Curated annotation (Swiss-Prot):
Keyword Ribosomal protein belongs to the record: yes
GO cellular component: cytosolic large ribosomal subunit
Signal sequence coordinates: none
Pfam families: Ribosomal_L25p, Ribosomal_TL5_C
GO BP: translation
Key words of the record: Ribonucleoprotein, Ribosomal protein, RNA-binding, rRNA-binding
InterPro entries, sorted: Rbsml_bL25/Gln-tRNA_synth_N, Ribosomal_bL25/Gln-tRNA_synth, Ribosomal_bL25_b-dom, Ribosomal_bL25_C, Ribosomal_bL25_long, Ribosomal_L25_dom, Ribosomal_uL5_bac-type
Protein name in the entry: Large ribosomal subunit protein bL25
Species this protein is from: Thermoanaerobacter pseudethanolicus (strain ATCC 33223 / 39E) (Clostridium thermohydrosulfuricum)
Function text: This is one of the proteins that binds to the 5S RNA in the ribosome where it forms part of the central protuberance.
Length: 201
């Protein structure tokens, strides 16, 4: 996991304060977690946060700078306006670099085109994994190579290779991907089976 700095300012609570911040290009945030007696209401520049997320994704180790002090943190939650799709609030969780944390990591699938070229249909059940590791070991994404799968094969959580120092929390027997036969092929197989049964009668 990369380490990226973002500056934040302390904010007053209340609707009027929130409106002023919005007019200045800020969105509300909050910092809480390890070693903190109480949470700190913050505000971050919307455009800077957007650029950070576009470049690094949500699984990024942050140096949240507040009044000259730096806090190691991760993005715990992002709230979005469901209609506009814009971020309206972000939670930063302060972490210890020496204690493991849980994080949700997206899966990046490779080899799908090869399966489809062989006539298979890739059916996804999981698009992300929950993992546990030290903050600086959490990957931004986990690459899953599907190129060796054949029609009828199933890939389970336990089959996915993760980086050293990373432990998967999800059920190892949970299905990630199944490779199905094309519907036409299934129907043809059923018709052939029916005809064979009739001939045997």
């Amino acid at each position: 996991m990369q380490s990226v700095s973002i500056e934040a300012i302390k904010r007053d609570t209340g609707k009027n304060a929130a409106r002023r911040l919005k007019n200045q290009g800020y969105i509300p945030a909050i910092l809480y977690g390890k070693g903190m007696a109480e949470s700190i209401p913050l505000a971050v520049e919307y455009n800077k946060l957007q650029r950070l997320l576009q470049k690094h994704g949500r699984n990024v180790l942050l140096n949240v700078i507040v009044d000259g002090s730096t806090h190691n943190a991760v993005i715990k939650e992002i709230q979005e306006d469901t209609l506009k799709g814009k971020i309206i609030h972000v939670d930063f969780q302060r972490v210890s670099m020496y204690e493991e944390i849980e994080a949700t990591v997206p899966l990046k699938f490779e080899g799908t085109g090869l399966i489809e070229s062989r006539g298979g249909i890739v059916q996804h059940q999981l698009w992300e994994l929950t993992v546990e590791s030290l903050p600086d070991k959490i990957p931004q994404e986990i690459v899953v190579d599907l190129s060796n799968l054949e029609i009828g094969d199933t890939l389970f959580v336990k089959d996915i290779q993760v980086p050293e120092g990373v432990k998967v929390v999800d059920d190892p027997d949970e299905i990630v991907v199944s490779v199905l036969a094309p519907r036409e092929s299934e129907e043809e197989a059923e018709e052939e089976a029916t005809e064979t049964a009739k001939e045997s009668e």
